[in-house]
Amino acid sequence: LISLKDSIDSGDIDLITRVYDTVIQQSATSMMRTNYEISSLDNIKEAVIRSIMNSKLLEAQYLGIELYIEIPDVIDHLPIKLIDLIVLFTGLVDNAIETAKGSRRPFLSIAYFKQDNKQLFIIENSTKTNRVDIAKRFDAQQQNSAHFLTVLDSYPQITLSTKSDHYRLRQLLEMR
C-alpha cells in the first residue's frame, strides 16, 4: 500500500499500474486462496482468546501450513484465568507452528471441546523428524518455556500430555 501511495503521489500511471499488478493483485489472490475460516472460532465466546487464536492461525496459514479446526461446543466458561489460558494456548500453538514448518506436508489440527466436566484442547501437527524431543524444545526456548511451565504448575486441575511419533506431534491440554 505504501508503494501504491508513492506511485500515486508521483503521478506516474505506468508505475501505479505496475505496483497494482505486482503487489495488490497478488496479495488479494493469496488472501482469497485461504482455507481457514474465522467462523471456525465462533464457538469460543471469549473475544480475546478468539482473537489470539485467529492471529496464530493466520500466521500458520501464511507459512503454508494447512489448517483443520473443530470447535463443536460453545466454550463460554474459562476453567482458569484468562491471562494464563492465553499463555498456555499461545505456547502450544507456537510450538505446533514451529515444529510443522518445513515438514513434508505441513498441517496443524486443533480441536477444542467439552467432555463430561472437562475442556479438552488438542493440537496435532506434522513434523520434520519422526519424533520431536519435547525436552530439547523446552530447553531451546527456556524463557518462554519457564513461564509456560509456571502457569501449568499453578493449576493442579490441568494436565498436559504430549506424544510425538510417525512425523506427528500431539499436545493435549485437559482442563477440569
Spans of model-derived segments:
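A conserved cytosolic signaling coiled-coil/coupling helix that links sensory/transmembrane modules
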Residues: L1-A28
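Glycine-rich/acidic phosphate-handling loop/turn and adjacent ATP-lid/helix
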Residues: Q119-T150
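Conserved short strand/loop->alpha-helix "switch" segment adjacent to the catalytic nucleotide/phosphoryl-transfer site
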Residues: L41-K45, L67-L88
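Conserved ATP-binding N-box helix of the HATPase_c
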Residues: L4-D9, L82-P106
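Glycine-rich phosphate-binding loop
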Residues: D133, N144-R168
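Short beta-strand/loop element within the Bergerat-fold HATPase_c
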Residues: S103, F107-N117
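Heptad-repeat coiled-coil segments of the DHp/HisKA dimerization-phosphoacceptor module
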Residues: I69-D73, K114, T127
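Short beta-to-alpha transition helix within the HATPase_c
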Residues: R18-Q25, L41-L63
